[in-house]
Amino acid sequence: MLVLKCSTKLFILENMLKSHFPESLKVYGAVMNINRGNPFQKEVVLDSWPNFKVIITRREREAETDNLDHYTNAYAVFYKDIRAYQQLLEEHDVINWDQVFQIQGLQSELYAASKAVAKARLLDLDINLASFKAVHFSPVSSVPDHSFLTGPTPRLTYLSVSDADLLNRTWSRGGNQQCLRYLANLIACFPSVCVRDEKGNPVSWGITDQFATMCHGYTLPDHRRKGYSRLVALTLARKLQSRGFPSQGNVLDDNLASINLLKSVQAEFLPCRFHRLILTPAAFSRQAHL
């Protein structure tokens, strides 16, 4: 096991991961953020360098953690050989198994392999799997049309940390203190876009997570069918692209409104799927918010 700390090697790794798109996109986004100030206090673990077979990004061990905060306690995985992934987890302390955490990736064997590792280590864990369509936005070469935002309001801008409570209340995965803190950190660290009404309150928004993934795109019910979601998505994609980041996202199979929106802006549905595992030790099973 190797924790890659050298800044030169981390930039080399960033370029190496491009040749493994789209499966490496989650790890690639995390590595890009590490190389640009590392606001989420992540680090890279590999089986070897430079001829690696598996890469895992994780929270730095010295970073402050909350054992119930699976949003922040999230690992991104890319492997060339699934056996190398299993071996790394079985033989080394790559993961903190004593807290609620996530494993994210774009490879189909992730769930079965992670479950096998937990069994081999005799761990009493509940593993919750969610699978999504993975998407990538085409280059947004021009500023999205926002001429319909006439007058001083509504206006296109970005989120502030004070908006985190609204996002926490409206996100299907939110509604708890861990999520509130996580969303506030995302807003503080990464690009966001929102439309605000005449009172300055957000009515439509999108944010970016620790893996440079566009997420939590949402419009309040009273403000739907006005073109806000499309405007927010394209503006956020363009903002990420202008900074050199991939404009990637995920969508549930039954979220037809979002799927139709993505089709309308010519987003590419990737051949791989996004897999999110939430792993909960038995000791936290009644406390965790999934």
Curated annotation (Swiss-Prot):
One of its GO terms (cellular component) is mitochondrion. The keyword Lipid metabolism applies. Pathway: Lipid metabolism. The keyword Lipid metabolism applies. Keywords: Acyltransferase, Lipid metabolism, Transferase. It catalyses: an acyl-CoA + glycine = an N-acylglycine + CoA + H(+); (9Z)-octadecenoyl-CoA + glycine = N-(9Z-octadecenoyl)glycine + CoA + H(+); hexadecanoyl-CoA + glycine = N-hexadecanoylglycine + CoA + H(+). Its EC number is 2.3.1.13. GO terms for biological process: lipid metabolic process. Catalyzes the conjugation of long-chain fatty acyl-CoA thioester and glycine to produce long-chain N-(fatty acyl)glycine, an intermediate in the primary fatty acid amide biosynthetic pathway. InterPro entries: Acyl_CoA_acyltransferase, Glycine_N-acyltransferase, Glycine_N-acyltransferase_C, Glycine_N-acyltransferase_N. This is Glycine-N-acyltransferase-like protein 3. GO terms for molecular function: glycine N-acyltransferase activity.
